[in-house]
């Protein structure tokens, strides 16, 4: 998918508030169900798992519904993965206290404003402090991992918390997306793939088989990084005879990073006026993301970024300013004479200040010494 296709329905920095309500019994078990990757081959054929392979270092984009990639690309990335299976698993940033504090800040913003479930066609209010991208349910079938990568890259480079919400129409009504348990598993694996293999510097350092092997926990992005995850928030009240299987998809970026990120294709993204914008090159990225972001106080833009020069001021001025801006014409000549005299006095006073008593003594001593040398040495020779 081309970068020009990335056009979320809505994008905003939120301002609103939504209160919690009691969680229905079905909703309480949703998270546990989503963690399950089917172990029986009849329900889920692991041999057809496109996410088992494909450490996406060649710009591959998965479809979020089918989880498929082109066969030719599949063989290439599979061969590359077999070479990289000995990569050690690293999650140092999970132990970083500063990262944990930032994640906690996001969790506080999210939990205080987002409900545990939504009523069908209810209004989606803004969320304060979190950049929010909204997509409708029709866009879900066309979405690819590229759109997730571009938005995540923009959020990280712009130092924003972010939510990508899929299942909200043009009127901000929550419709959700119809998803089976298998669909949710495929989406989780797609997000894990998008985050684990596409970013430079890497967001997750992990070998492909460790990431997408038999263990179901390794298929959830929240198990390998604390900065990004996905939630499936239940949407209830749909008048269908079938069981309730509508969810609002919420992809969350919970960490603010000081690094500059790009995806494997070399593209760099940034947030501008609530939109995901591709930057032209790395030079532009460093200029906008480092120089401009480091100058947080707008006042510093008025002068040197290294030193702020003081404002002009008057000290011991000979001219007395009055509240009136008009000076009578008969006083003009007097003012000029007064200013001239004050200027001459100031110059002479400045010279005297430079010459203290000690300096005057040395001047007299030098003059006397020069006179003696002239009389005793130079004058007899001239005669």
Swiss-Prot record:
Its main location: mitochondrion. One of its GO terms (biological process) is primary piRNA processing. The keyword rRNA processing does not apply. The keyword Transmembrane helix applies. Belongs to the Schlafen family. The transmembrane domain is mediating the localization to mitochondria. The proximity to mitochondria plays an important role in piRNA production. Component of the PUCH (precursor of 21U RNA 5'-end cleavage holoenzyme) complex; consisting of tofu-1, tofu-2 and either slfl-3 or slfl-4. Within the complex, interacts (via N-terminus) with tofu-2 (via N-terminus); the presence of tofu-1 is required for the interaction. This is Schlafen-like protein 3. It comes from Caenorhabditis elegans. The gene is slfl-3.
């Amino acid at each position: 998918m081309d970068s020009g296709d990335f056009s979320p329905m809505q994008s905003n920095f939120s301002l609103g508030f939504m209160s919690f309500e009691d969680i229905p019994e079905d909703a309480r078990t949703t998270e546990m169900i989503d963690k399950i990757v089917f172990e029986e081959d009849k329900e889920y054929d692991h041999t057809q798992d496109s996410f088992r392979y494909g450490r996406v270092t060649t710009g591959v984009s998965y479809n979020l519904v089918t989880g498929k990639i082109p066969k030719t690309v599949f063989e290439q990335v599979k061969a590359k993965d077999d070479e990289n299976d000995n990569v050690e698993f690293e999650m140092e940033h999970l132990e970083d206290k500063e990262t944990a504090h930032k994640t906690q800040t996001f969790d506080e913003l999210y939990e205080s404003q987002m409900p545990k479930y939504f009523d069908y066609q209810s209004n989606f209010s803004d969320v304060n402090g979190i950049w929010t991208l909204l997509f409708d349910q029709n866009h879900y079938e066309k979405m690819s991992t590229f759109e997730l990568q571009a938005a995540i890259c923009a959020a990280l480079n712009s130092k924003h918390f972010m939510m990508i919400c899929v299942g909200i129409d043009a009127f901000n009504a929550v419709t959700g997306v119809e998803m089976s348990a298998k669909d949710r598993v495929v989406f989780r694996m797609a997000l894990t793939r998008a985050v684990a293999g596409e970013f430079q510097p890497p967001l997750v350092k992990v070998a492909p088989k460790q990431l997408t092997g038999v263990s179901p926990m390794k298929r959830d992005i929240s198990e390998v990084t604390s900065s990004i995850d996905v939630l499936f928030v239940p949407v209830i009240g749909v008048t269908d005879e079938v069981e309730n299987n509508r969810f609002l998809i919420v992809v969350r970026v919970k960490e603010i990073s000081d690094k500059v990120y790009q995806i494997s294709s070399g593209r760099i993204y940034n947030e501008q006026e609530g939109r995901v914008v591709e930057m032209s090159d790395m030079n532009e990225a460093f200029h906008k993301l480092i120089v401009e972001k480091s100058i947080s106080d707008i006042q510093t833009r008025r002068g040197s970024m290294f030193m702020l020069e003081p404002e002009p001021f008057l000290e011991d001025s000979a001219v007395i300013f009055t509240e009136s801006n008009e000076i009578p014409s008969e006083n003009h000549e007097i003012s000029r004479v007064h200013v001239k005299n004050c200027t001459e006095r100031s110059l002479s006073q400045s010279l005297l200040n430079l010459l203290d008593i000690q300096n005057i003594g040395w001047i007299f001593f030098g003059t006397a010494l020069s006179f003696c040398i002239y009389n005793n040495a130079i004058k007899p020779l001239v005669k």
